Amino acid sequence: MKTLFVIKLVVLISALLWKSCAGNLYCDIYEDELPSSCKDILAKYPGTPSGNYDIQPVSYGPTITVYCDMENKRCGSKGWTAIARVDMSLPGSQCPGNLHLITDSESGIRSCGADPNSIGCAFAEFLTHGIEYTEVCGMLRGYQVGSPDAFGPYVNDQGNPESFVDGVIISHGTTPDFIWIYANGAEKVPSSSSNIVCPCTGPLYNGVVPPYVGTDYYCDSGVVSDPQGGVFYPTPLWTGTGCNPPDFCCSASGLPWFSKKLPLPTTDYITLEVCHNELPENTPLDQIQLYIR
């Protein structure tokens, strides 16, 4: 009788283990521990397709389900763990963090931006769940409202760390350490010398890119010339199209994707801020994708 009980118990445990592992491409890892990231999964199982997987970023910590992009050639490598995948065109989509929902009445485009009634930045923090990473990759799609000033605020408001660009700031940690900037200039073709257009629009640009930004930025405008206050321009920004030579920061290779290698490994959360220093201007986003590796 005792032997029969043991056999039944073994069968029951086996059935439960099989049920928990059904459809899991790395079930045998359960005998030891779950992988800590999508990169870890790919290292153990080359050829694993993109999809949702369970990982355990911290040993003996909680298990979380993440989306793994295993074939993202736009980031220059594989095995990326998604920390943000926002598409406001999908039904039921909501703006992350304290980004404000902005709906254009004419185009119907739903997007997430800064507070339309207050200057400054609105932000969203994306957790990395303890995953150690040295690379960040992602893409944004945004739109121009009114006449944003690109890096004009840095020239006009130096000394204010929260007011150096109209557009989007991606950073990590509390310092913060900047990862990438998506700047939004007033117009593609300025008619006179200006510091509120993109730095690479040509000899008429007389502004300054903050030294701590370096070359880790894109810049674009949603209107050719003469932007009007408060108008939502439905032409997507940072697509690499409609640029005018020598507008290299508008037509840079890889747009709208960026990829950045960090100097040191970190587990910091990543912050995305949409900023504007005047009303009525904004740079709302309808697509946000951020990955770490």
Name every feature range the model reports, one short phrase each:
Residues 2-293:
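Mature extracellular or lumenal effector domains of secreted proteins
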